[in-house]
Design a protein with these regions (language model features):
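N-terminal start-of-domain structural block
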Residues: 136-138, 162
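Accessory C-terminal segments flanking Radical SAM cores
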Residues: 3-133, 140
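Conserved glycine-rich "GG(E/T)P / GGGxP" loop and the immediately following alpha-helix
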Residues: 143-257
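Extracellular/periplasmic envelope-modification machinery, especially enzymes
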Residues: 128-136, 186-192
Length: 257
């Protein structure tokens, strides 16, 4: 679907970006975050898109009424990485960064920084901003289209876990899914817990680690990859995840990651 990207101008050529160092984050230009059931995030710290990146909504268009279990979201078990990476949502998100906008969905990092802590935004900017800066004007003129596939992958291939860490959620841990389900049956589930459980239920049962389609795309794009973080669940509790990681290690690109 071709649509005008919110926050951009129809013809950016000849215009300059308006990057605000207090708000700019390199993450949407270099990294993608997957979840164990195939949905994705701009990064792990973002708020407001707990069900995944929507196919038909931009960030500013999301409301509690139109973002639900029925909302079409990208799922990398079936949708291509390329389609998600340069979706309207992602291009719009990048243009917000290039136009110097403050993005409320990024408030977790801003709260950390206000407390004197090093946020993910600061950490990733230190690693990637200098390298990415020369490319940003081109991305701006292309309304947020990035022609380099993700260089940093934050991958969750499954939610299979052997621990019940209380700070975790049912969408990330199979053990916490069981705990939340037990509390639901006992009538002890508070609204915030129930909301997290409902989202986890909507994700289905199949793990991303079972998707040959997704894994082939990762293997085909390793030449661009500099960093890979594998998270869970517990990564080593899921045999297909371990096998996939081993297969990456056997490639000629592993020495660069």
């Amino acid at each position: 679907m071709d649509r005008k990207i919110s926050g951009s101008i129809s013809d950016t050529k000849g215009h300059n970006m308006n990057i605000d160092d207090k708000n700019f984050c390199v993450v949407p230009f270099v990294q993608l975050n997957t979840r164990g059931k195939g949905d994705a995030r701009v990064c792990c710290s973002i708020t407001g898109i707990e069900r995944g990146i929507p196919k038909e909504l931009l960030l500013d268009e999301i409301t509690s009424e139109n973002y639900s279990a029925e909302t079409p979201v990208y799922n990398l078990m079936n949708d291509s990485i390329a389609d998600l990476w340069n979706s309207d949502f992602m291009k719009d998100f990048r243009m917000k960064m290039l136009n110097g906008e403050y993005i409320p969905a990024c408030e977790f990092c801003h709260r950390m920084e206000a407390s004197g802590l090093t946020s993910k935004r600061i950490g990733k900017n230190k690693r990637f901003k200098e390298k990415t800066l020369p490319l940003l004007q081109k991305y701006y003129e292309r309304n947020g289209h990035v022609d380099i596939m993700p260089q940093w992958w934050e991958i969750r291939l499954s939610t299979k876990c052997n621990l019940s860490c209380i700070m975790c959620t049912p969408g990330l841990s199979s053990m916490m899914y069981k705990e939340y389900s037990k509390w639901e049956k006992q009538g002890k589930s508070i609204p915030m817990m129930q909301g997290a459980l409902d989202i986890a239920k909507d994700g289905g049962q199949e793990y991303l680690s079972s998707s040959k389609f997704f894994k082939k795309q990762i293997m085909d794009n390793l030449e661009h990859c500099l960093f890979m973080e594998f998270r869970g669940g517990e990564v080593f509790a899921d045999k297909p995840s371990v096998k996939f990681i081993d297969s990456i290690g056997d490639t000629g690109y592993a020495k660069n990651i």
